[in-house]
């Protein structure tokens, strides 16, 4: 929210403070896992742009991984734990703008394709919420209009699950789906892709 509101000084101050606190873990070889694409983008790219001379920020940036990216890397290098099972329904997967901005490919889709026999529909468009912008009363209807193509595509897939790496985008898509005609029921909640993987493990 501070970045969206243009408070770059506070964002830079936070970057320096957090990066300094995380440096011992980074130096110990720990990966820093971001659960949402916006956080990963901030740590990887936006903080280094705001404080380019700070070595702690540079180190944190290099150590940061999006959680889906991290799981895919583990699957490729070490393999995943046994026990993945097919799901009881298909998944409409939204790829958030901040995932695409990281230039790491469709890591959430790649991760979900590790699930046996998965029926996966990938939606690669803006959901319309725009961070905190789309949840305000004055912008909400406009945000729904922007996200209508995504909501329509998600509704037309008639998949049991809707997933997005961005919690705000997932909730926004469901709100849009409620306004789009369709025979299949709208899911009660949107899941993070990692939650879908957990379901496939029976968790």
Show the residue positions of the predicted features.
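Iron-sulfur cluster-binding electron-transfer modules in prokaryotic oxidoreductases
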Residues: 1-203
